[in-house]
């Protein structure tokens, strides 16, 4: 990236969500300043659910949760919410239907599903500024 920024200093670089990691900042240094990312989970969000999740995760594991960890956490939350709603009627079709009708508010934001079962999710846009990930903007996946 250093060479790219030397050749094209005015072009904004947009990374993909899996690039969102503290390791990128450590390895990239100044070369990654200003790079933007769409992310499904932003650990520095001011959302109280996110703050509590990050605090509890750090206490237990000694580091911040990754986006994949947050997605797994919300996936479990979606499943358990559906099962709790159904009570004793917990066959797989009933669970699937309960999940399909749900709008779940989790640490990765709102999760819901369209008629095809595809997830509808908003992304948060972040950038690297002074060696830290900071919020650029929040928005939809459109």
Task: Cite the ranges covered by each PLM segment.
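Extracytosolic ligand-binding ectodomains
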Residues: 1-142
């Amino acid at each position: 990236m250093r060479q790219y920024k030397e050749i094209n200093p005015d072009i904004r670089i947009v990374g993909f969500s899996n690039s969102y990691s503290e390791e990128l900042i450590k390895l990239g240094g100044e070369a990654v300043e200003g790079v933007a990312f769409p992310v499904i989970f932003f650990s520095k969000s001011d959302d109280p659910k996110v703050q509590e999740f990050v605090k509890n995760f750090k206490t237990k594991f000694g580091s911040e949760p990754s986006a994949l960890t947050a997605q797994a956490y919300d996936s479990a939350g979606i499943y358990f919410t559906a099962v709790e709603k159904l009570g004793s009627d917990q066959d797989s079709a009933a669970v699937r239907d309960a999940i399909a009708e749900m709008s779940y508010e989790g640490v990765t934001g709102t999760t819901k599903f369209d008629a095809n079962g595809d997830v509808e999710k908003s992304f948060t846009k972040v950038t690297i500024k002074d060696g830290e990930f900071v919020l650029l903007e929040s928005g939809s996946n459109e």
